[in-house]
């Protein structure tokens, strides 16, 4: 399974093409649109989300509510494009129109300046448009397809925010994936401890009044994962490594950890390793899950627990200093629409990319042309691992 995304933030539409989804997977636009709506939601989102109401359109690969095995093409229209027809025109236009909304003051922390240098742009809008987090719309759409596949294989996935700008959220112990999903969905800030809800919302309001932004940490948890996905035989086949790459590819994500993560560096080995248990009913399990579901780059049957750290959104309403690329004079950075935080939305994107990598790994291990073949292969493998 592989995919590509295309489109600009203020272009006419966003597109994704997925190849390798087996035939026969039940799939409708509603399966995608629910996740797209959650990506646009969350406390603290800005004006762009009031303009767009993302709805996916299938243009290939799905017929009568099921995948056909052909490449799946999905489009999402950018409604805001109508205000940018000249600025984002694919055809050459008059110079006086080209100068409208031209960007020569790069924003610190964005791709603006480095993209301009790399691709030799005199208008940094070209960097801004493609590097925008608007692209994650299609990664969420791709992830929704992947999640539909994982659900057919009895795997479930959820995300929630565990740190808001330095404020850690206490997470009740032993929550199931379903409970995490339910609690986070009921929270405007995607947390599972509702006693902290108003405190976090008040904090976001204060950050907005200050013209500033905050980052944080989001966690994705996956249950029902088969043992042995990934491999130790080559560095690039380790599944936790593939997941780490996918997570830090998300806009503004700067770090990733599994299970205890960096805390493991402060503990003794006896306080980190997960003791192995066996029972006739469950087969092999672990007493704890400090390693986040991975040993040797492979899934060990425990829930996958992965966290990603998101830096504060770099577009500030009180902009930092920058330099004009035409005059080299100091200027305040360009201000585009921004949010005080996008952590709840980022959690949806992280959930999507994790689901996508897991679907890719499943289809690599259990190559199948149609869904029934895949389900039979996975069920047979689960029986084998349980009775090993």
UniProtKB/Swiss-Prot annotation:
Recorded metabolic or biological pathway in which this protein acts: Metabolic intermediate biosynthesis; chorismate biosynthesis; chorismate from D-erythrose 4-phosphate and phosphoenolpyruvate: step 7/7
CDD domains named in the record: Chorismate_synthase
InterPro entries: Chorismate_synth, Chorismate_synth_AroC_sf, Chorismate_synthase_CS
Keyword Amino-acid biosynthesis: yes
Cellular component terms per the entry's GO annotation: cytosol
Example of a GO MF term: chorismate synthase activity
GO annotation, biological process: amino acid biosynthetic process; aromatic amino acid family biosynthetic process; chorismate biosynthetic process
Amino acids binding FMN: 130-132, 251-252, 296, 311-315, 337
Manner of cofactor binding, per the entry note: Reduced FMN (FMNH(2)).
Protein's UniProt name: Chorismate synthase
Primary enzyme class: lyase
Physiological role: This reaction introduces a second double bond into the aromatic ring system.
Key word Transcription present: no
Catalysis performed (reactions): 5-O-(1-carboxyvinyl)-3-phosphoshikimate = chorismate + phosphate
Cofactor list: FMNH2
Residues that hold NADP(+) according to the record: 39, 45
PROSITE patterns: CHORISMATE_SYNTHASE_1, CHORISMATE_SYNTHASE_2, CHORISMATE_SYNTHASE_3
